Amino acid sequence: MKNWKTLLLGIAMIANTSFAAPQVVDKVAAVVNNGVVLESDVDGLMQSVKLNAGQAGQQLPDDATLRHQILERLIMDQIILQMGQKMGVKITDEQLDQAIANIAKQNNMTMDQMRSRLAYDGLNYSTYRNQIRKEMIISEVRNNEVRRRITVLPQEVDALAKQIGTQNDASTELNLSHILIALPENPTSEQVNDAQRQAESIVEEARNGADFGKLAITYSADQQALKGGQMGWGRIQELPGIFAQALSTAKKGDIVGPIRSGVGFHILKVNDLRGQSQSISVTEVHARHILLKPSPIMNDQQARLKLEEIAADIKSGKTTFAAAAKEYSQDPGSANQGGDLGWATPDIFDPAFRDALTKLHKGQISAPVHSSFGWHLIELLDTRKVDKTDAAQKDRAYRMLMNRKFSEEAATWMQEQRASAYVKILSN
């Protein structure tokens, strides 16, 4: 299940979300700065949204309302893509292939199965790749621009970490859907009142049993509107503070709001709740190593053979590991300490080094191991379980604050970009 913080970045990581068949020259739906949104763009995404909705059993509003939402989404995408072009943001084929492989994996498909499914749904694979590339560029631009505007202070981290440690519901996760009734920059009192009345009307409809997803698609100005407002799973502390406070006593099925923020009025639906315990005890390893780096005077094979010779001398008692490390190791940070790396969690090491280390028993010396640094001889001295409660809570608090502030700032940033762009809608 995707986490809502990923969804807020706007990447449509679902296998059947793509524009349809290759586009031809057609009418312009909107002019966006020095670019355009074509009618075929709108029609393609309309087809995709309807396909997704049909497969998910999601109700949709009338075509005119749906088209408006889709056009606004494409206008915003065009604005951000233009920014990415000016910034020189590129997505390599390797990055794109890895992203698509991850999408296939998330949907429990092989790549061949994904291609077949796209073809079955009438979606062109080449066009699908291009759209995923665009979405990755949009995500990178948004992440870079929004994160530059965010500051997380140490005292904020300490305060939230303390709160996490004392709250009984710190591990509670919620599955939410969201509707945003947007306000323009510097709204008038009349605009605020109109938006509030509309939000209150939507809340009443939702509480009377109206389909929340359809309401989101119809009215919401949020980037997830076309997905029925679905935000997915996340912890309450990861939400903006005004949301977290309103949801502190919420139950499954509750409609919460309207909640006023700087960008408009928010309505939330609690689709589900769950508890998730978090282990904060970690295993640390105490290891030492001898590193030989291949060079013009010592190739890979010679380095490996030299380490085998050193290992044999250690095991026969001709020398000790510490003495050999001081004599031969080319790691300046540990050689003088007899190769001692101190206590650390295995995940800080090079993957090849880490994998070899975690397979060793206490007191065991590895065979020569090749990593990105060279060739290693590794000895596992000891392991221990360490209570990392305080550090884990602070790390968790920092990530929650980043996610919370990103969510708040991203909405403001997108509103600013939309307001400052030249946009002319040419069709209805």
Curated annotation (Swiss-Prot):
Residues making up the signal peptide according to the UniProt record: 1-20
Catalytic activity: [protein]-peptidylproline (omega=180) = [protein]-peptidylproline (omega=0)
Alphabetical keyword list: Chaperone, Isomerase, Periplasm, Repeat, Rotamase, Signal
Principal subcellular localization: periplasm
UniProt keyword Isomerase present: yes
EC number(s) on file: 5.2.1.8
Subcellular location: Periplasm
EC primary class: isomerase
Superkingdom per UniProt: Bacteria
Domain PpiC: 171-272, 282-382
Gene Ontology biological process: chaperone-mediated protein folding; Gram-negative-bacterium-type cell outer membrane assembly; protein stabilization
GO molecular function, one term: peptidyl-prolyl cis-trans isomerase activity
GO CC term (a single one): outer membrane-bounded periplasmic space
Keyword Repeat tagged: yes
Domain notes: The PPIase activity resides only in the second parvulin domain. The N-terminal region and the C-terminal tail are necessary and sufficient for the chaperone activity of SurA. The PPIase activity is dispensable for SurA to function as a chaperone. The N-terminal region and the C-terminal tail are also required for porin recognition.
HAMAP family: Chaperone_SurA
UniProt function note: Chaperone involved in the correct folding and assembly of outer membrane proteins. Recognizes specific patterns of aromatic residues and the orientation of their side chains, which are found more frequently in integral outer membrane proteins. May act in both early periplasmic and late outer membrane-associated steps of protein maturation.
PANTHER family (UniProt xref): CHAPERONE SURA
Protein name: Chaperone SurA
Species whose genome carries this gene: Salmonella typhimurium (strain LT2 / SGSC1412 / ATCC 700720)
Gene designation: surA
